[in-house]
Amino acid sequence: MPSGKGWKDGAAMNAIQKYFKYRQSLIDQYAKGDMTKREYLQKNYEAVVYGDIGPFRNMDTVEKALFNYQYYNALAKENKTISTTRDMDYELKRDYLEKSNYYYSRKDRATLTALRMLDFRGVVAYFVKVRSRFLKGKLFEIVIEEENIILHSTSPLVLNCLREEGVFQEESRKSLIDEYVNHRY
């Protein structure tokens, strides 16, 4: 069996490709109506948490940064969902929300890493038209056009970086994945 950094990087890249292929099949099933948004989120969560790879400490490729985005986004959404459990103790609810916010901050770090590696080339960002009053004027979409990648954030830090790089368009648009974005889970 080969050893060394090259082999590990190759195995990691194969695992990342395998994950994104599986994720695309989940997206296709959701788009066809074969699964609910909650089922999609649960299966995606299981894929990143119980898969062959975990988050990368060293995000030295765009692919690793994008995997970390998915990993931390899945954990954030799962913890946020758990926090809405009825009759949950207030302290426990707060703990889950704090974990969710922590994971969202890690997701935003991965977002910035990927964008910086791309030098913000081929990136367009804008606010998303949402039904949620809480997310209105906060949620924005980041599109990496050449790769057909869509990311979302509410981070003021990410927003400021996008503005500084001149890729944020000061308008609200319908999300490219509007049905998903505006569907509650």
Model-predicted regions and their roles:
Residues 8-42:
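Short terminal alpha-helical segments
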Residues 9-13, 31-34, 49-73:
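Short, charge/polar-rich alpha-helical segments
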Residues 23-26, 65, 69-72, 76-83, ...:
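Non-transmembrane amphipathic alpha-helical segments
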Residues 30-39, 81-94, 167:
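Charged, low-complexity interaction regions
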Residues 35, 40, 140-144, 151:
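Short linear proline/tyrosine/threonine-rich motifs used for host-factor recruitment
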Residues 38-44, 89-109:
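Short, charged, amphipathic alpha-helical segments
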Residues 51-58, 102-121:
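Amphipathic alpha-helical coiled-coil segments
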Residues 155-166:
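A short, charged, amphipathic alpha-helix used as a generic interaction element across diverse proteins
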